[in-house]
């Protein structure tokens, strides 16, 4: 498996917008341009769904993951009409996860990186699930090992819990 990553940051050091352009393939990737049509788009900050037109960059049949606490009824209110319409008309697979709630319950506070990373690997299915879990756990151990076993375990918990807290949403009602 080959991967290519390009990250586009705004001028804020913390709390700003980051667009991650990731490519995966069985052959070496030598593309020098940003992704214009994606198979997967995630929005980690629910306020961005009104600010930025993210779903328009999804190919038909692509996957959109929104990190939010909204119920299906609240989604109806919070999602802009053009977002709902694009999702429905283009057969977008739409999922939500409440990363903040998961992080707080596990003890990670507002840190959602492991939660959303786990959700990405589950939904994108670019490598087998068991392999993804093993690799994420190894990365958590390498990244947080010096902070202690408790922090490592909280990240292991985030990996496991994220898989079960993804919510798929029917989108026919958006037509």
Q: Which residue stretches match the model-derived regions?
A:
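Active-site cofactor/cluster-binding pocket
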Residues: 1-167
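Single conserved hydrophobic/aromatic residue that forms the stacking wall/gate
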Residues: 165, 172-175
